[in-house]
Amino acid sequence: MTYIENIFLCMVSPLLVAALCMGRRQLRLFLFCIAGMGVCLLSAYINTFLAAMCQADALAATAEIAPVVEEMMKLLPLVFYLLVFEPEGDKIKAAAITVALAFATFENVCYLIQNGADRFSFIFFRGFGTGAMHVLCGLIVGGGLAYTWRRTWLKVAGTCGLLGAVITLHAIYNLLIAYGGAAQYIAYALPVLLVAAGRLSIFRLSRKQ
């Protein structure tokens, strides 16, 4: 049995100490890191509860329950940030990526502790794939929120649309992972390639301008 709340405390403790030492400018970064790990912890409990309540098998829990719960939980700190502080677009994107990155880091650490770290090649691909998938979802949500929340009429519909898009992407990723074999490695490679392609296109556009 993995006591993920103990892992959470061990990982968050140095972040809290660093946040106190770094000053107000960097405080936001550490708070979003802690929020990302916190929602990952809560997502694990909610996933387990819903899977037990719905009597879902492993595939249903992975492809149907987990993507919805995890993406909704990752959105909550961002919505709170938007409602309370009304930040600028660049700050929204940075917050979304930080939450997603912290979520992926905590998830990977828990996976390593539960399943072991003896298979380097598999862990390598999983680490990059899962991290890139969560960061890609963060990029989509962050960029989308920065656009939609500047327009009052688009806030609710835009947020729901972005949530639906990242849930679908997350579900496809989890389905490919659950299928196993070559599909599993395609799933690990796909988000990395999408992030790389996105960065390359942005670089080319900036050079043309």
Enumerate the predicted regions with their spans.
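Hydrophobic alpha-helical segments at protein termini of multi-pass membrane proteins
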Residues: 1-209
